[in-house]
């Protein structure tokens, strides 16, 4: 997947909603096995904390690798003390300069396109995101 992105070394955002984490996990594990020094920000969103079915894994990555950062984002659980809201809200609040970032976005078509649009509105370059959604559910531009 990453070979489809422009050859740059800015921060990589692995953005996953729900079970989309399985794809982000595979990419993260591959990068870590290669010994990447590139900053990697893993954002995993779910409606409730139970949707983060293996949150201990990306937490461990961030403890073991100083270049890896993990943020869990919960949208529908008021007693959650971490980041709340939608994934793109957390991303635009956290990342000062989205123009230097690249992203892999894993989730439903609505989530992927909403995230892309919000990030572009904050300086992200559209051609710096890859997602299977762009192939399986292309946006109707008419």
Residue ranges, per PLM feature:
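Histidine-anchored nucleotide/phosphate-binding helix
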Residues: 21-33
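A short acidic Gly-Thr/Ser loop motif
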Residues: 17-18
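Short, flexible hinge/linker loops that cap or flank conserved catalytic cores
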Residues: 5-8, 34-36, 97
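A broad, low-specificity signal for short, low-complexity segments enriched in glycine/proline
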Residues: 30-35, 63-65
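Reductase modules of NAD(P)H-dependent flavoproteins
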Residues: 39-142
